[in-house]
């Protein structure tokens, strides 16, 4: 796909004279364009749901969720991956973010990195990619060689693959097994895909990882019941989670958390089923860590 024909490279009539308006009007123009992004994501919800189901199947079987991108797309993948361990208590290697140019590229532009097909393949090889893993290639344009080559390599290994881009029919979309293509239109600043396209990608990644965690039993109701208390704020959140899930007092919640080494799931089962920590943990283990199953089946 030629660059000049890409939707993400088009000129936006709404912002054609944005350099001549007041600061407030400038903000209104950007905000009006941003409002269109959730609607673009809404149109591809069935594609997102299909990807979540595949990711959950693979991860449940021992695989990993791997994000692969360059520039803004790569940084968004790293952001999403890095939030999964503290939020959901998963091991750091379960959700992985890879960026063209490596760690240095998280804060700096690395010239030519996104054009390296070899880089995309080597980065996946370096993390020991297996057929059980799912590779999600992220590229607003859908033409990034680093991402395309990585997806091709992943498919050769037998991995399930997902391509996220904002240009219909792009190479990323056609290379991946599952395509997620929120079409957000031309950017306020022509070609600045960190804006609407980046926002759309962030919304999609939020759904992919959150959907995976919900289906994996990491959420009870709407509570993050595997949250790791790494600071005072999260200690308080743990108490509130146990309170909200059980209706007990803050003192009861704290006592249960202390008794089970601050595991919200165990504390919730302890309170609701009137069990000690060891028995509550045993029952959770018997039901794969799903609180709902412990409560419904016993």
UniProtKB/Swiss-Prot annotation:
Gene Ontology BP terms: 1,6-anhydro-N-acetyl-beta-muramic acid catabolic process; amino sugar catabolic process; N-acetylmuramic acid catabolic process; peptidoglycan turnover
Highest taxon listed in the record's lineage: Bacteria
Keyword terms: Carbohydrate metabolism, Lyase
Segments forming a coiled coil: none
Residue ranges of every copy of the SIS domain listed in the record: 55-218
GO molecular function: carbohydrate derivative binding; carbon-oxygen lyase activity; ether hydrolase activity
Catalytic activity, as annotated: N-acetyl-D-muramate 6-phosphate + H2O = N-acetyl-D-glucosamine 6-phosphate + (R)-lactate
Induction or repression: Induced by MurNAc 6-phosphate that releases the repressor MurR from the DNA. Repressed by MurR in the absence of MurNAc 6-phosphate.
PROSITE patterns for this protein: GCKR (PS01272), SIS (PS51464)
Protein name, per record: N-acetylmuramic acid 6-phosphate etherase
Organism of this sequence: Escherichia coli O127:H6 (strain E2348/69 / EPEC)
């Amino acid at each position: 796909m030629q660059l000049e024909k890409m939707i993400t490279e088009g000129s936006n009539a709404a912002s054609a004279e944005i350099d001549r308006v007041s600061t407030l009007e400038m903000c209104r123009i950007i905000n009006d364009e941003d409002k269109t992004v959730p609607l673009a994501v809404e149109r591809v919800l069935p594609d997102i749901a299909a990807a979540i189901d595949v990711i959950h199947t693979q991860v449940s079987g021992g695989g990993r969720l791997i994000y692969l991108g360059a520039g803004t797309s790569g940084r968004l993948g790293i952001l999403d991956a890095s939030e999964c361990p503290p939020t959901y208590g998963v091991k750091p290697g379960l959700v992985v973010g890879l960026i063209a140019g490596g760690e240095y590229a998280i804060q700096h532009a690395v010239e030519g990195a996104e054009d390296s097909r070899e880089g995309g393949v080597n980065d996946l090889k370096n993390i020991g990619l297996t057929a059980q893993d799912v590779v999600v290639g992220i590229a607003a344009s859908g033409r990034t060689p680093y991402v395309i080559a990585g997806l091709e390599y992943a498919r050769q290994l037998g991995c399930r693959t997902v391509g996220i881009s904002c240009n219909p029919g792009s190479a990323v979309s056609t290379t991946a097994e599952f395509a997620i293509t929120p079409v957000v239109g031309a950017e306020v600043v022509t070609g600045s895909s960190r804006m609407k396209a980046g926002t759309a990608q962030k919304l999609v990644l939020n759904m992919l990882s959150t959907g995976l965690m919900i289906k994996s039993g990491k959420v009870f109701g709407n509570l993050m019941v595997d949250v790791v208390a790494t600071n005072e704020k999260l200690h308080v959140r743990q108490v509130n989670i146990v309170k909200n899930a059980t209706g007990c007092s803050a003192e009861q919640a704290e006592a249960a958390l202390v008794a089970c080494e601050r595991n919200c799931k165990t504390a919730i089962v302890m309170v609701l089923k009137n069990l000690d920590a060891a028995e509550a943990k045993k029952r959770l283990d018997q039901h794969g860590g799903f609180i709902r199953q412990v409560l419904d089946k016993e």
